Amino acid sequence: MKIFVVSDVHSYYDAMMDALIANGFDINNKSHKVVICGDLFDRGKQAVKCFEFATQMAAEGRLYYVLGNHEELLFDCINDMQCRNVREHHITHGTVDTIMQFTGLNYYDLLGGWCLDEMEVKMKPVLDFIIDNTVDFATFEDYIFVHGWVPSDAKTRKVDDNWTSVDANWAAARWENGMQAWHRGARIPDKTIVCGHWHCSWGHSHLHQDRKEFPAKNRVDWQKSFEPFIDDGIIAIDACTAYTGFVNCLVLEA
């Protein structure tokens, strides 16, 4: 069995598939499974294709889907629409556009509240899929897959004792810069945490201090800043796809 791990695809289906295929993924090979470390949607223009891929993998028992903050933002945005008070970040982060892609409705109909019933009907399969298929974290051998980080205490710099519990503060952990949490000491002995959410160039720039955080794209090898940040107990893989145009893919084999 091979496990292909991606994160923060943000509706860039082609970039995701390019990364998967380049790393040997075969959609027809039932022993090839996919981990998505959250944020499958928003920002890009291929939300529907990403959803169709995820539903196919889930139907075949080949998907591990970790809940990201943008999945939560999707629910928040729909709630805002129902209350006719859509906050600006839902527009700037691309969540409204994601709903437009899934529903075929335009910006003014959604924000004006004219087509709420139609929107709710068309979004229901997407929301139900997220509810039924996402988890706070997934594990494989000595690897733990999360979106931001595992629940931890910034003061004690330790991982919460109850981090595996459904009562743990995963809502906050999803927004955590995992590299920063790891750096301050929130680690799990003998485990490697694979995370997304925060562009991995942050770790190269601020922690390893060997690459620019946002190098100009006319620089030679600028893409290297966005390669996975790897250190003892952490692999951060968010490639900042909306900026770089590519997705990182980690391959693990049983």
Predicted regions and their residues:
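Active-site environment of divalent metal-dependent phosphoester hydrolases
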Residues: 10-14, 42-45, 71-75, 197-205, ...
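Short amphipathic alpha-helical segments
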Residues: 17-18, 48-49, 78-79, 157, ...
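Acidic, His/Gly-enriched loop-helix segments that form or flank divalent-metal centers
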Residues: 100, 108-235, 241-245
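Short beta-strand-to-coil "C-cap" segments at the C-terminal boundary of structured domains/repeats
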Residues: 251-254
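Active-site neighborhood of phospho(di)ester-bond hydrolases with catalytic His/Asp-centered motifs
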Residues: 6-7, 35-38, 65-69, 146, ...
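A general structural motif
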Residues: 29-31, 60-62, 141, 189-191
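N-terminal active-site segment of His-dependent metallophosphoesterases
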Residues: 1-53
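Active-site neighborhood of divalent metal-dependent phosphoester bond hydrolases
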Residues: 30, 43-136
